[in-house]
A protein has these predicted regions:
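S-adenosylmethionine
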Residues: 1-251
């Protein structure tokens, strides 16, 4: 789980959970993470109802810090926000300052994000249903852009081992096409000097490094440079498989 540092620190949350009969321990390489000692229905806990934490895989918790949020960051656009796990993490890193625009194609997911944001006390999040006209107006406006791209989900086989049998070549071809289209389109939202993070919960190079390389070789990516990338393998970390790449727009 990820501690909501807008409301509480990790030590205090661990103490409150213990008082509710839930034992946990900190993860040393994840500053806002607690791991449960054993499975528990923590969604019924008072700490959850009070918005003191969110359930989020440890690998997923690496994405927001990877974006290098500092005092100069005033606007972040989370382009594929879904129900907002990473959006809420970004809100804590901004300390409820600045503006986070959370976008998605599904209104239902954005409504869930709004509910979670209220529970978390995150007030710097604005949700937007993706609209081509709005996207054009937002070009060049963001200090940071997060693309948590739709993917095969092969990094989460640890939790969903049946997923690999559902993957067909046609699906992979389609998802890779979508990923590149998203990179081409949403990279335009970034300011000169801004940074974009492309992330997936897949470990397939064709969804990850190869997508970034294709983008950098394209007209849309000619002013971008790869700053850093990281692959997290589930068998090494014990958590979900993940990929992250950080690009800077040298415009």
């Amino acid at each position: 789980m990820r501690v909501n540092t807008l409301k509480i620190n990790r030590d205090r949350l661990q103490q409150l959970l213990r008082e509710e009969g839930v034992e946990s321990y900190p993860l040393q390489q994840y500053p806002d993470a607690l791991q449960l000692v054993e499975r528990s229905n923590i969604f019924k806990s008072q700490s959850f109802k009070d918005g003191l934490f969110e359930v989020q895989d440890a690998s997923s918790q690496k994405v927001a810090p990877f974006m290098q949020i500092d005092h100069s960051v005033k606007r972040i656009i989370d382009t594929c926000a879904g129900a907002g796990g990473k959006t809420l993490h970004l809100a804590t890193l901004l300390q409820n300052k600045g503006q986070i625009i959370a976008m998605d194609i599904y209104e239902q997911k954005l409504q869930e994000l709004k509910r979670r944001a209220r529970r978390n006390g995150a007030f710097n999040i604005e949700t937007k249903l993706i609209d081509p006209k709005q996207l054009k107006r937002m070009q060049g406006s963001a200090d940071r852009v997060l693309i948590d791209a739709p993917c095969s989900g092969l990094g989460v086989l640890r939790r969903n081992p049946d997923a690999k049998w559902k993957l067909q070549p046609e699906f992979l071809d389609q998802i890779r096409t979508t990923q590149q289209e998203i990179l081409q389109q949403y990279s335009k939202l970034l300011k000169k000097g801004g940074k974009l993070v492309y992330a997936t919960c897949s470990v397939l190079p064709s969804e990850n490094h190869q997508q970034v390389a294709t983008f950098l070789a394209s007209e849309a990516g000619k002013n971008f440079k790869l700053e850093a990338e990281e692959v997290i393998f589930a068998h090494q970390s014990g958590y979900d498989g993940f990929y992250m790449a950080r690009l800077i727009n040298n415009g």
